[in-house]
Amino acid sequence: SDDGAVVSCGLTRDYGHLPASMVGPTFNLASTESLKRLIDSNETDLVIPMSIDWAKMPWANDLLSSSAKVFSPTGGSMLIERDRDFARELCNKYNVPFPKAYVARNRLHALEIIDRHPKAFVIKNPLCSPQSPVHTIICQTPGDTSAWLECVDYAEGVFLQEYLGPREAGHIAFVVGGEVHSLVTNQEYKRAQAGNMGIVAGAPMGGLVEADPDDKYGLAAAMLHPLKPWFKETGFTGPIQATGIYHNDCWHAIEYNIRLGITATPMILRMLEKPASTLMQI
């Protein structure tokens, strides 16, 4: 709206409606018969989803068949975040270093894996979603790993990724037409705002962000540029974050995130001189 766009909001949850209503008109998508009709009748030009879970909603096909552009990757290109094992295979294909990782179906399977490979593992959800029963649990010893595996929720299984240390950073870039355009480098405070004060078992507490269009730390060069053939093949369009651990003198990719939502979209848009017209051209 700061760039002159007329903004409205589609509500997908039963809470947090006040902030959206202060910006413009709101529409409850749960009671909307046809999202396509709503978009077309309001002459909406662009839809910016706030979560990758939009693609799993009952109105997703309505959105894609509407007259509006969607600022998000679509279809198979979303697997780079959605399916952690897919991301591992993609890195192997394009020679991007990736920690040893395994998918376990249940507790017994997970314990069998760490019996065969007695290392510290980071425990993650294999299918990434804000609603997943498991979020990142960093284990720094084999004992920590075993203890956590006794009490996590195995409804979707678990993704076990070898722990490579604390030297972690992320890099956000725009991908358009198979090309990678660097934006920022960021570092999350996963343990506490002022240093390492315990094991992580949940979302980060905050972070630092540095404008980095020249990729001064080499994160994009190591983890995003090698994937350009795949980005072009799938038509991946939108913001992506590659997060890596610096280990044995190189960056190892630990995950990729499609950067949609309140934590990243406002920052990205404010970095653009003309955000509304730029997004319409992508």
Where are these regions (language model features)?
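Peripheral (often C-terminal) accessory segments that flank ATP-dependent C-N-forming ligase machineries
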Residues: 280-282
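ATP-dependent carboxylate-activation loops
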Residues: 259-277
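Short, high-confidence coil segments that cap the C-terminus of an alpha-helix
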Residues: 43-45, 118, 155
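ATP-binding N-terminal substructure of ATP-dependent carboxylate-amine bond-forming enzymes
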Residues: 1-74, 108
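Internal nucleotide-binding/catalytic subdomain
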Residues: 134-261
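Short, charged, surface-exposed secondary-structure boundary motifs
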Residues: 18-21, 37-38, 79-85, 132-133, ...
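A conserved helix-loop-beta module that forms one wall/lid of the active-site cleft
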Residues: 65-136
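Short glycine-rich anion-binding loops that position phosphate/pyrophosphate groups of nucleotides
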Residues: 52-54, 126-128, 259
